[in-house]
């Protein structure tokens, strides 16, 4: 039993290190946002291609026991939480919560985003006009 406790203690130490590293990452991201705001009038700096390149680099170099798909989800949530340090993304989507649109928005933008449901296509576009959301997720046929 002592061996299991030793392993758990090591996991706890790693968890503590992960929290410190995630917080350090957040601090650096805030600094990047401050630098970007000096150069741009934009108040939001979501850069999807940067996120894609990070996910590609991390999954390519992993070599560990976690499947790449799991790493993608972990990093999606880190990106979402990091963006929320500035201001959460506001994602408009068609339908109530738990619909396919809502689930797709969570998968793409993470749980730290703010999700704004709309009952019809007209109201979802009105959200953009009123600046109530920064991104729309609509079904394209």
Report residues per predicted region.
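Domain-level signature for soluble enzymes in the chorismate/prephenate branch of the shikimate pathway
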Residues: 1-141
């Amino acid at each position: 039993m002592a061996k299991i406790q030793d392993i758990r203690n090591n996991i706890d130490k790693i968890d503590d290190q992960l929290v410190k590293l995630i917080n350090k990452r957040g601090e650096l991201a805030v600094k990047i946002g401050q630098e970007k705001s000096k150069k741009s009038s934009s108040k939001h700096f979501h850069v999807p291609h940067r996120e894609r390149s990070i996910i590609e680099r991390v999954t390519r170099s992993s070599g560990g026991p976690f499947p790449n798909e799991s790493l993608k989800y972990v990093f999606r949530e880190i990106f979402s939480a990091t963006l929320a340090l500035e201001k959460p993304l506001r994602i408009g989507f068609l339908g109530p919560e738990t619909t396919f649109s809502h689930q797709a928005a969570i998968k793409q933008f993470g749980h730290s985003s703010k999700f704004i449901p709309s009952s019809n296509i007209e109201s979802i576009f009105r959200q953009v006009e009123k600046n109530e959301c920064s991104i729309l997720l609509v079904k394209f046929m």
